[in-house]
């Protein structure tokens, strides 16, 4: 069992693996859509690219720093989904001018997935360097902030959807993660502001905790037996469901991929009555 299953949640059901409701009956229509995924060449980001490719979107743009994994991701996606155009950009999301240029080159983007992140060394707060703390906030907060600003300035005929891959560390004290947890909390609150201040319902912004997966980046910080690892298809299919028509009432909310979507839909009245429900903040 994952350590995260013990956290309080608004749904009775906790999924640790994907399920038919989001894997097969997600109601997302990918026809003609362009998806931009930062950090999309590996791990959760790559699994999200796979999920959207399965929905027959027109284009998937992957932004990541490492050319090798990026080329491998492109080749694998093209082999499995030859009708989907895969475009790649080797760039750091902290290069704000470059990211704005990528958006301009792509043209209309229907779904922006913010998955790129940095995790510092697992050390006490007294041992984290100023450079590590700065990097956590540069990559995890400022880069998504600038990218969403640039995205909102672009023109899209339909709905714009921002999906921010957050972390349970945003809502809890994660030992030896004094930079990572606060940076993810800050980014999630920034997304809540974009959602609350939106000029039109044609913009939807979501943040969600993806789960625990033994990816190469996670292996740099955790042992294989440190927790119960989960199905990486779960956050991918949940992200795709968020991009569909059923999730609009959850605009601005912080969610978990593990929460059953039909049970979330059953909470719609409460969500619409209480603007603070399912957000990062103080509950008394």
Swiss-Prot record:
It comes from the Eukaryota. GO terms for molecular function: oxidoreductase activity, acting on NAD(P)H, oxygen as acceptor; oxidoreductase activity, acting on the CH-OH group of donors, NAD or NADP as acceptor. NADP(+) binds at residues 37, 180, 184, 215. The active site is at residues 166, 180, 184. Pathway: Secondary metabolite biosynthesis. Secalonic acids show unprecedented anticancer activities against various human cancer cells and might be interesting for further derivatization, targeting diseases such as cancer. InterPro entries: NAD(P)-bd_dom_sf, SDR_fam. Its EC number is 1.1.1.-. Keywords: NADP, Oxidoreductase. Pfam families: adh_short. It is an enzyme of class 1 (oxidoreductase). Gene3D superfamilies: NAD(P)-binding Rossmann-like Domain. Belongs to the short-chain dehydrogenases/reductases (SDR) family. Short chain dehydrogenase/reductase; part of the gene cluster that mediates the biosynthesis of the tetrahydroxanthone dimer secalonic acid D. The pathway begins with the synthesis of atrochrysone thioester by the polyketide synthase AacuL. The atrochrysone carboxyl ACP thioesterase AacuM then breaks the thioester bond and releases the atrochrysone carboxylic acid from AacuL. Atrochrysone carboxylic acid is decarboxylated by the decarboxylase AacuI, and oxidized by the anthrone oxygenase AacuG to yield emodin. Emodin is then reduced to emodin hydroquinone by a yet unidentified oxidoreductase. This is Short chain dehydrogenase/reductase AacuD.
């Amino acid at each position: 069992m994952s350590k995260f299953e013990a956290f309080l949640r608004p749904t009775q059901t906790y999924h640790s693996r994907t399920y038919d409701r989001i894997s097969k009956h997600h109601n997302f229509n990918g026809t003609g859509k362009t998806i931009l995924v930062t950090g999309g060449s590996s791990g959760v980001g790559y699994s999200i690219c796979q999920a959207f490719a399965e929905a027959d979107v027109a284009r998937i743009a992957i932004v990541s720093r490492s050319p090798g994994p990026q080329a491998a991701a492109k080749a694998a996606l093209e082999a499995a989904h030859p009708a989907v155009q895969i475009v790649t950009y080797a760039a750091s999301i902290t290069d704000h001018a470059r990211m704005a240029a990528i958006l301009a080159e792509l043209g209309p983007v229907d779904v922006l997935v913010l998955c790129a992140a940095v995790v510092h060394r697992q050390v006490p707060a007294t041992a984290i360097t100023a450079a590590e703390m700065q990097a956590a906030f540069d990559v995890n907060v400022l880069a998504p902030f600038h990218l969403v600003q640039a995205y909102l300035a672009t023109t899209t005929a339909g709905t714009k959807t921002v999906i921010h891959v957050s972390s349970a560390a945003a809502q809890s004290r994660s030992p030896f993660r004094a930079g990572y947890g606060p940076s993810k909390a800050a980014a999630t609150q920034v997304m809540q502001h974009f959602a609350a201040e939106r000029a039109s319902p044609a913009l939807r912004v979501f943040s969600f905790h993806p789960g625990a997966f033994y990816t190469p980046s996670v292996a740099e910080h955790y042992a294989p037996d440190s927790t119960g690892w989960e199905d990486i298809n779960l956050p991918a299919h949940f992200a795709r469901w968020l991009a569909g028509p059923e999730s609009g009432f959850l605009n601005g909310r912080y969610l978990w991929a593990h929460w059953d979507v039909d049970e979330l839909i059953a909470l719609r009245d409460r969500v619409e009555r209480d603007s603070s429900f399912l957000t990062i903040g103080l509950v008394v």
